[in-house]
């Protein structure tokens, strides 16, 4: 202990005479008188008592003796009720005494000024954070963000190679592949294509209806795109593949009997292959084309834009295509090509899912040519919209 005291000298002596006197006598140390001109003594000057304080000074002691178990707050309530119950004549002596004390206080302390004590504020639980600390932590977080985004993009690229797609997680990567032009280079899109918009925005800019369709991914891509290494993909709703006769002029029509499509379930859009590139072999599936469908071009109703279709039906539709591909088309042709056969309509429904329009709405040759021209123009517009 002595070595510690020697190593750390104290500016003041450790001896405290007041503490020694208290310990020796067992009594409180005597109060040290202060000079009247001292500022500390003026700050401790008490206010003169009013009439209630003069009366309650003795009355509180009497109630405390009578009710020793009562709290001081309860005693104050009782004193307040008793003071209000007193009459003016009973309060008169206490009012006079308070006036005398006030005059005496003015003589003793002519320069007295009332300084109310500040209430002790509770210590704040949360302290102010240093702005430098916030800036440093923010910079560290921003430096870590590109690494996380690049790592997550690499994982998404592996999922794309394996054919695994999630509508929620694959959207940023697919958006980067779609919006990037052919000059983006081979392979997948770079992270810059995804991070071009600020992350403070709730939604990325340049949103279009095609962006909503991109998580479902295209199932039929042109081989020339893979050969040239262009990452651009043409999004469309998943559905059955089509034969080359219908690929240049895909049509989607609406009929009073329901929505009719060529070789697929109602409500699914169609797409033509990219010009200048040979279409994928999946377009030549024999199970989805039949000569009876050639009549549909002559009987078209009001055209409507292709509606959205949920992506989770794509696998079911592909499995149905594979099952139909295993069947022999000649078995259907010998029944469906027979004129006047009662099962021809039933066979058409089993193959395409709807009744042939030729049995419902016969039309003339002039109307047929006009509707065909309008249908081709509308199909060309929709194809250009989906490609762009």
Swiss-Prot record:
Gene3D superfamilies: High mobility group box domain (1.10.30.10). Widely expressed in adult and fetal tissues. Present both in mesenchymal and epithelial cells in some adult tissues, including colon. Tends to be down-regulated in prostate adenocarcinomas and colorectal tumors due to promoter hypermethylation. Residues 268-388 form the Sox C-terminal domain. Residues 36-45, 146-164 have a biased composition (Basic and acidic residues). SUPFAM superfamilies: HMG-box. Interacts with CTNNB1/beta-catenin; this interaction may lead to the proteasomal degradation of active CTNNB1 and thus inhibition of Wnt/beta-catenin-stimulated transcription. This is Transcription factor SOX-7. It comes from Homo sapiens.
């Amino acid at each position: 202990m002595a070595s510690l005291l020697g190593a750390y000298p104290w500016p003041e002596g450790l001896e405290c005479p007041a503490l020694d006197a208290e310990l020796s006598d067992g009594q409180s140390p005597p109060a040290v008188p202060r000079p009247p001109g001292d500022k500390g003594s003026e700050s401790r000057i008490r206010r003169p008592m009013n009439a209630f304080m003069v009366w309650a000074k003795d009355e509180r002691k009497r109630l405390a003796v009578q009710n020793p178990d009562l709290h001081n707050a309860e005693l104050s309530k009782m004193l307040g009720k008793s003071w209000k119950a007193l009459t003016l004549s009973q309060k008169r002596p206490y009012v006079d005494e308070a006036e005398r004390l006030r005059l005496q206080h003015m003589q003793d302390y002519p320069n007295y000024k009332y300084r109310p004590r500040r209430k002790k504020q509770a210590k704040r639980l949360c302290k102010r954070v240093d702005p430098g600390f916030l800036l440093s932590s923010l910079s560290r977080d921003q430096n870590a963000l590109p690494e996380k985004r690049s790592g997550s993009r690499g994982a998404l690229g592996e999922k794309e190679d394996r054919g695994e797609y999630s509508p929620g997680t694959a959207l940023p990567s697919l958006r980067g592949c779609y919006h990037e032009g052919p000059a983006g280079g081979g392979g997948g899109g770079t992270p810059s294509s995804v991070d071009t918009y600020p992350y403070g925005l709730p939604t990325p800019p340049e949103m279009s209806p095609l962006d909503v369709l991109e998580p479902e991914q295209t199932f039929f891509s042109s081989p020339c795109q893979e050969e040239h290494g262009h990452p651009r993909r043409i999004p469309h709703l998943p559905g059955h593949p089509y034969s080359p006769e219908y690929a240049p002029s895909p049509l989607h029509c609406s009929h009073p009997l329901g929505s009719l499509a060529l070789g697929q379930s109602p409500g699914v859009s169609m797409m033509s292959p990219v010009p200048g590139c040979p279409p994928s072999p999946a377009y030549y599936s024999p199970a989805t084309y039949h000569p009876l469908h050639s009549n549909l071009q002559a009987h078209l109703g009001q055209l409507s834009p292709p509606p959205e279709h949920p992506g989770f039906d794509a696998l079911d539709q592909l499995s149905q295509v594979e099952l139909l591909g295993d069947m022999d088309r000649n078995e259907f042709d010998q029944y469906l090509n027979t004129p006047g056969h009662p099962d021809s309509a039933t066979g058409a429904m089993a193959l395409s899912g709807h009744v042939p329009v030729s049995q419902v709405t016969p039309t003339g040759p002039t109307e047929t040519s006009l509707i065909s021209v309008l249908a081709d123009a509308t199909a060309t517009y929709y194809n250009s919209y989906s490609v762009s």
